[in-house]
């Protein structure tokens, strides 16, 4: 069962899931800070799912504005236990419902995962790659 999470202790369990994500650029501290700020700003929404007392998925949404000032809902962090593949669809549907509730025009996410993996997992929900980010790392 998926529920909205407002328990700061539970946020620590969610940040622990970052350890299971290969090549995650989001740090535990940053993710935790986002979730805590959501308790006060109503711009971050954290959802969690449990089966038999064990976390099997989580979703962190961030409400922001894009470059032209339109509201955008960002999938900041999604983790789903490999034994529950259908849970991703439920989380995407929650994000869609939240976007409709907030009258948001776009849902987006940033990932450094392989394009083929992302296409296979999210194209069926209507997500499309709309741009590429080119960056220079400054050391």
State what each model feature region is.
Residues 1-30:
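Short amphipathic alpha-helix that is part of the acyltransferase structural core
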Residues 32-34:
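Elongated scaffolding segments in large macromolecular assemblies
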Residues 43-44, 122-128:
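Short glycine-aromatic motifs
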Residues 46, 50-84:
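Conserved donor-binding loop and adjoining core beta-sheet/short helix segment
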Residues 36-48:
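A short helix-loop-beta-strand connector motif used in the catalytic cores of GNAT acetyltransferases and
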Residues 20-24, 40-43, 86:
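Membrane-anchoring hydrophobic segments
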Residues 70-125:
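Acyl-donor binding region in acyl/amide transferases
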Residues 110, 128-139:
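Conserved catalytic-core motifs of GNAT/GCN5-like acyltransferases
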């Amino acid at each position: 069962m998926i529920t909205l999470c407002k328990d700061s202790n539970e946020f620590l369990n969610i940040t622990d899931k970052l350890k299971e994500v290969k090549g995650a650029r989001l740090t535990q501290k940053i993710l935790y800070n986002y979730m805590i700020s959501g308790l006060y700003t109503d711009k971050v929404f954290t959802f969690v799912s449990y089966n038999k007392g064990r976390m099997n998925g989580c979703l962190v949404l961030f409400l922001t504005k894009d470059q032209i000032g339109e509201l955008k809902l960002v999938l900041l962090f999604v983790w789903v236990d490999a034994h529950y593949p259908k849970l991703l669809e439920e989380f995407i549907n929650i994000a869609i419902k939240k976007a409709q509730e907030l009258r948001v025009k776009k849902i987006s996410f940033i990932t450094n995962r392989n394009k083929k993996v992302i296409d296979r997992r999210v194209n069926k929900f209507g997500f499309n790659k709309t741009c590429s980010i080119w960056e220079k790392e400054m050391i």
